[in-house]
Amino acid sequence: SMIEMLGVLAIVGVLSAGAIAEFGKAVFRWKAIKCTEEYNLFISEMLVYEKDWIKMMSKQGSGHLYIGPYMEEWGMLPSSWTVSGNRFSDRLGNHIVPFVRNDLMSFSFNRRVDIDFVLSQRKGKETAEFCRLVFHNVIIPNCDRIFAIRVAEKRNDSWNNGSGWYMGCQYCRDSRNCIERINAADIESLCNVCSEEKQACNILTLF
C-alpha cells in the first residue's frame, strides 16, 4: 500500500523532514479511520445481544454490568484490539468500555447498553481530530440506534458534567439537544475538550 511504501522510504532516509511529518499525519488518519470502522462493527455485534445484556443486568440489580469479558470470550472483538480487565484498547490507544448501567437517577437512562469511548490524551490536537472523526463516522451514522451521548473531560481524577446529553434520532423532542441537529461547528466545540493534554476525555454513548 501507499502507507507501507512511504514507511519504507522514511526508514531509509529518502523522505525530507516535511515529507516525514506528512507521512505521520497520513498514518494517523489511516489508523483513525480503521478505528471508526472497527467501532461500527463492534456496535453492531454488541447490539445483536442487547436484550440478553439487559436481562443479565436485571438479575444483577444495581450498579454496572461490564459485558466486555463476555464479548471477548465470544470472539466479538476486532483483531487489533487488546484487552485489560473490563476495557479494550484500539490501535490508537483509546479505551472502549462496554457496560449496562442501573445507577442513574433518571430511570429512562438505566438498563441501557452503554459504550464509554475514553480517548487518548497524549496526542492533544490528534485526539480532538479523532473525536471529530468519531462523530462523523460513528455517532451520526448510528443516530437511529443511539439513545443519547455526551462528551466530558476528566480533571483531578473526576469527570465533569461535560456537554450535557444529546439525544438520538428516535428520542429528539422539542427543545432537546439532538444528534440529528449537530453541525460541524457543534462538533468542533464538543471535541475541543479533547485538544489539550488533560487526563482524559470521553464520549459516553447510550443505546
Please report, for each region that a protein language model flagged, where it lies by residue:
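Intrinsically disordered, low-complexity regions enriched in Pro/Ser/Thr/Gly and acidic residues
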Residues: P78-F207
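Short, glycine/small-hydrophobic-rich surface segments
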Residues: M46-S84
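Membrane-proximal N-terminal amphipathic helix
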Residues: A21-M57
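N-terminal single-pass transmembrane signal-anchor helix
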Residues: S1-V27
